[in-house]
């Protein structure tokens, strides 16, 4: 019988290799980080950045408040991580639309319909954006990750608008960023 290793969360796991404990701890760390992010999303969406409390996030996530500071340097970094995850989710869903394969008008209609439905299904997204807008996008401005996520969408929109201009469906000079906003 393989040896048993006692882990931080007191689960006995048979060990097949020396890396087993590290892998399990890594999965536990990932799960803990995800729980903190989920709790933080709910807290920030419900109370805004200014009203959200780290203690409430700790309580919602079921972890000690000190553990939140192990994963995130502070409230600003946690809020930014929530924003980045939220943007990653919507950008991944938008990629599934395959807008580049549709005609210009249909692509824009699909994006508008999708965006509206996403906002309806995920009202926390709008609450987070409203909170960030109140702070003049101070967190978004610091995020290279969000800029990198937005760039392909802006490029795709620009291509769609150009195809639409060539097909005389759209007028020229439409800024893809302003259109999306």
Q: Which positions does each model-derived feature cover?
A:
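N-terminal intrinsically disordered/low-complexity leader segments
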Residues: 1-31, 42
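Generic hydrophobic, amphipathic alpha-helix propensity
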Residues: 32-40, 57, 82-86, 90, ...
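Helix-turn-helix
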Residues: 35, 43-77, 81
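Short coil/turn segments at alpha/beta junctions that flank glycine-rich nucleotide-binding fingerprints
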Residues: 46-50, 100-101, 122, 167
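Short helix-capping/turn signature of helix-turn-helix
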Residues: 72, 131-137
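Hydrophobic/aromatic residues within well-ordered alpha-helical segments
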Residues: 75, 82, 86, 90, ...
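Hydrophobic alpha-helical connector segments
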Residues: 95-127, 147-150, 154, 176-180
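Hydrophobic alpha-helical bundle segments that form small-molecule/ligand-binding pockets
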Residues: 140, 150-179
């Amino acid at each position: 019988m393989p040896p048993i290793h006692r882990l931080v969360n007191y689960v006995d796991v048979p060990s097949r290799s020396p890396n087993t404990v590290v892998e399990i701890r890594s999965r536990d760390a990932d799960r803990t980080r995800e729980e903190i992010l989920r709790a933080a999303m709910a807290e920030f969406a419900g109370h805004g950045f200014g009203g959200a409390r780290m203690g409430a996030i700790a309580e919602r996530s079921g972890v000690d408040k000190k553990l939140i500071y192990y994963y995130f340097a502070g409230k600003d970094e946690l809020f930014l991580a929530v924003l980045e995850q939220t943007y990653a989710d919507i950008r991944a869903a938008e990629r599934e639309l395959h807008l580049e394969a549709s005609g210009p008008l249909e692509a824009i209609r699909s994006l508008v319909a999708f965006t509206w439905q996403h906002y309806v299904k995920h009202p926390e997204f709008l609450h987070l954006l409203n909170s960030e807008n109140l702070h003049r996008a101070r967190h978004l401005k610091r995020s290279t990750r969000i800029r990198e996520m937005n760039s392909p969408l802006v490029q795709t929109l620009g291509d769609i608008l150009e195809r639409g201009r060539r097909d005389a469906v759209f007028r020229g000079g439409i800024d893809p960023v302003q259109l999306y906003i």
